[in-house]
Amino acid sequence: QRFIHPTYRPPPQPRRPVIMRA
């Protein structure tokens, strides 16, 4: 189990995934 800090904020997800860029 990973300890998540109360002040930890996940990075905002990009609107368009660059990985699926063709």
UniProtKB/Swiss-Prot annotation:
Keyword Protein biosynthesis belongs to the record: no
Inducing stimuli: By bacterial infection.
Organism of origin: Heliothis virescens (Tobacco budworm moth)
Function description: Has antibacterial activity, preferentially against Gram-negative bacteria.
Subunit text: Monomer.
Tissue: Hemolymph.
Post-translational modification Pyrrolidone carboxylic acid, affected residues: Q1
Disordered: annotated span: 1-22
Any single GO CC term annotated in Swiss-Prot or TrEMBL for this entry: extracellular region
Name of the featured protein: Heliocin
